Amino acid sequence: MENPKVSIVLPTYNRIEWLVKSIESVRKQTYQNWELFVIDDISSDGTDSKMLEFCDIDSRIKYFKLPVTEEVGISKFLNFGINNGSGKYIARLDDDDKWIDCDKLKKQVEFMEKNPDYVLIGGGIIVIDSNERELFRYLENETDEQIRKKALLSNPFTHPAVLFRRDSAIKIGGYKVLEFAEDWDFFLRLGNVGKMYNIPEYVAHYLMAGQNISIKNQRELAKNLFGIIKAHKNNYPNYWKGYLINVFQLLHSYLPAFFRTNSTTFLRYIKRKYF
């Protein structure tokens, strides 16, 4: 098997303590042929000086300052990595996530090299709080058939778990500039040009802390998802189920605070059990 390079894209902003953990999780990978693009939205917490230290000790780490704007959002960072990386594959990390499987890249690259008709591979994640205590964990649908069946019901991949073919990402035009769910739309478009798979193993920690989305943004997210689901209705099954789920989520955002808090878990249960 060849030893193709993986370009890892890691956007960051004022999270130096978590960023260090993310970078160290990359450096612990048994698969060594990688380059890491840390793309900084002009942090003010000492990120630049710490990154210079990392660049001095590991030439595979590259640091860029690239201010983002509301008009282009995080898509600007992600497309910068795709367009400027030299790897055959692209992997993703956010500055508050980290890989927990030291063989994550090795396993995913081996699968992709053996299966050239696949364009995207992910894995399971463990969701943690700011004290790194486990909140819950989940494995995504594994096979291409299973993924496609539920691709319009919920996002079939999580960013810190994925690896995809760079040429396929360029072929579909990279990430679209969307206010929300640009990753979900990107994964669905990748699925239009090849097969998808999820390793049935936990490969990453995903931080859930201080990320509560405002009610206004919940409603905007739901409205955005209507457009994404509709755009892919002819490429994936269960369009009306996905549409109905999103209607429920939009209506849920209009409930009084007490009912929203006490119905969220129930809604998640219904979604997983019946959809």
Where do the PLM segments sit?
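Conserved donor NDP-sugar-binding/catalytic core segment of glycosyltransferases
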Residues: 103-135
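Conserved nucleotide-sugar donor-binding catalytic segment
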Residues: 83, 123, 137-220, 224-225
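Short loop->beta transition adjacent to catalytic acidic/histidine clusters or analogous donor-positioning motifs
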Residues: 3-6, 27-38, 46, 58-62
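Glycine-rich, basic loop-to-helix element that forms the pyrophosphate-binding segment
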Residues: 67-85, 95, 107
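N-proximal low-complexity "stem/linker" segments adjacent to membrane-targeting elements
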Residues: 1-27
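The conserved acidic donor/metal-binding loop of glycosyltransferases
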Residues: 94-98, 124
